[in-house]
Amino acid sequence: MSMNIGATAMSRSSQAYAVETCVPDAYHFSKAQSTGTRFIMMLTAVASGVFAGRVMHSTMSVEMALTGLFVVLAFVGGLLSTWSPCGYSSLSLLRPAGRYSLGAVTRWAPTFFTHAVGYAIGAVVLGGALGGISWLLFADVPLQYAVIGLATLAIGYGLHQFGFLKMPYPQRRAQVPHDARFRFRSSVIGLLYGFSLGMNYLTYVQTPMLYIVTGVALLSGGVKAGIAVIAVFNIGRCLPVAVNFLPVKDQSVQAWLARWQESAVEVDGFLLLAIASAALMLVML
């Protein structure tokens, strides 16, 4: 009887500890801009893209310009994925244990390393699969057709982000449980988290830039190119966790993310429209 009581007490204590150390979900975010403001931002994005496309067309090769535009879109798309439910929780779960100190950060460094390894594995698996499909089915698609198709899709999702068009948003509405840190060592959690997020479609999709990146990988022409495409996006997804090397409180990071939630969506839409417009100018001039 006493052993049962003791086990119950230990279980309750563990649950209480988990509740105390887990950061609650954020429900109050910054407000969206008015319809008029979003419309002006949309027009500005298109005009900026058209201007940038004309400038790049006269100063560099089309292939180099398109590569640069893609790298910007993919890397920033990875950064913007931090505003997903999994982005919030990864910054919270993958933190140094105890009070901030050089020793705590040093002991935590392997967790960041395994987290990055998980993202790398995800890029190899997802990018390799998409690149393989591209090699088999889409290797002969003309560059101009590919760019026009992906740019049109990007414009649609840019309008979606500004609230002027409804686009399909396929995703798996799942994330790693908040109590994950109590099941495995921190470095193991870092690896599992990195792989799950590095696969990109196993959890929530925060930015439709991922769909454009996926399309680029599908039209990349080979396995190596497909891996490189997803790797650029995953680098952007992985880097925000490095904020935990700094002496910042978890609550401060979560509050900052919540405060800029709507702005992240607007940046997302702006870049989709601007980069798509620039890409169209490059292949149509």
Curated annotation (Swiss-Prot):
Keywords: Cell membrane, Membrane, Transmembrane, Transmembrane helix. This is Methylamine utilization protein MauF. The keyword Magnesium does not apply. The keyword Transmembrane applies. It is a multi-pass membrane protein. The chain crosses the membrane at residues 39-59, 60-80, 119-139, 145-165, 188-208, 212-232, 265-285. Its main location: membrane. It is found in: Cell membrane. It comes from the Bacteria. It comes from Methylophilus methylotrophus (Bacterium W3A1).
